[in-house]
Amino acid sequence: DERFYGLGEKAGDLQRNGKRYEMRNLDAMGYNAASTVPLYKHIPFTLTRRDDVSYGLFYDNLSSCWLDLGNEIDNYHTAYRRWQAEAGDIDYYLFTGKRVLDVTKAFVRLTGKTLFGPKWSLGYSGSTMHYTDAPDAQD
């Protein structure tokens, strides 16, 4: 009874069970918010929650990769996890803890925190993708 989360920016539900994901950085113009894979950022980290324990797996490889989280049906095996990378080594880190927070803290200890810039840097930010779709974009 595992529940999978993570993988960075992905379309669809936050719970990733029963799906196969392609992970590579891609400018997915006009993507479908329910089903498009891949999107702009990928983080090859899954956080798994069970009733009694949480654990995370970080695949330390940023080449294009695929992760199956129970999508493939097999007559001989129950649902399973499968990771495949286009290139590079298979270095991975396993984090365990009672709570999701414990696993997240362990992952952050390895990868580092996101640092926020100074308040003055948080000025106006606009997206040109939105502007080009506007009927008055040329005005």
Task: State each model region's role.
Residues 1-119, 127-130:
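Catalytic and substrate-binding clefts that recognize carbohydrates or anionic sugar/phosphate headgroups
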Residues 133-139:
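Short, acidic/polar
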